[in-house]
């Protein structure tokens, strides 16, 4: 279903069964009660997982610059009864308007240049999404706003992380997606 839980549903089942540690647990170390800002909401896959991990005492705000995607994600999340708050806006503008250290974690998952085999609905998402890459000035604002860490997700093949001076966390050679952790306020990647 467009805008539906998709791969997040599988990730949530794995978390519930205790079988696998999700990247948001392993790399982001999300914990109950934390405040998360998903700066590139898309279909809200990561926001759904983050909401489960931070629980009812935490909060997740999803920012989406594409109006159609924001509407689809919001409708789907409301149908599910999710506590994720959706806001249609430019994430850079939102971040600039927030006080320093006002959220625990900022998450970026910019649009991948091409589909990964495991991503159903990617072509529709790409047609609706903002294709702009993550900019260094927006990353710097995220570091200012995050109390603990900024997470950046990217396709393994893309030079985006390297272009931002980031290194990805250890991942299996076959993993199509990699994550980088950036210490809040430091401007430096967290050493693996």
What is each residue range found by the language model?
Residues 135-183:
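Conserved Class I SAM-dependent methyltransferase catalytic core
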Residues 54, 99, 144-146:
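A generic alpha-to-beta junction signature in SAM-dependent methyltransferases
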């Amino acid at each position: 279903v467009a805008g539906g839980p998709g791969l997040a549903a599988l990730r949530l089942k794995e978390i519930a069964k205790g079988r696998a540690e999700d990247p948001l647990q392993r790399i982001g170390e999300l914990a109950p009660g934390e405040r998360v800002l998903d700066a590139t909401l898309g279909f809200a896959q990561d926001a759904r997982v983050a909401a489960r991990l931070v629980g009812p005492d935490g909060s997740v705000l999803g920012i989406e610059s594409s109006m159609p995607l924001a509407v689809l994600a919001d409708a789907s999340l409301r149908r599910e009864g999710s506590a994720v708050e959706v806001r249609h806006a430019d994430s850079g503008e939102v971040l600039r308007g927030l006080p320093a250290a006002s959220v625990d974690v900022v998450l970026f998952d910019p649009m991948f240049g091409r589909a990964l085999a495991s991503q159903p609905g990617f072509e529709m998402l790409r047609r609706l999404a903002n294709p702009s890459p993550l900019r260094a000035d927006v990353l710097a604002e995220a570091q200012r706003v995050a109390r603990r860490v900024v997470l950046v997700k990217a396709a393994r093949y893309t030079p985006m992380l390297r272009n931002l001076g980031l290194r990805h966390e250890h991942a299996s050679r076959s993993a199509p997606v990699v994550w980088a952790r950036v210490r809040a306020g430091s401007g430096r990647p967290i050493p693996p």
